[in-house]
């Protein structure tokens, strides 16, 4: 916000202090951040991936107050083996340390698959204030992170 921007060396505010209503105090809110499209074609990204889980449709999230550790769950995922989607997974999740996660991104799909995603219920404060946020991205690949699904792999696959 305008009051704290100078403390972190910024010449101007990022415009992140907002309020839900005229009768609430403004609070510093999450910035709407998007990832610029990369150069990968979606099919080429899948074909170039040997062993992974492609996750779709965000379901829930949790991040600590310092924004250091996080966990996200999705409604659906696809197991990828040898560059092919081989089966659907229910409620997959991923977790990690924020800086390690972002530094592990090695591929981002092109603008053909870029979408502006949003959440209508980012809440904070007392009394609670709820605001919508938006983040745009294309499918991307992140290496070496903990993933899990609601159902374990059958013993024959392990």
Give names to the regions the model predicted.
Residues 1-158:
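N-terminal small-residue-enriched
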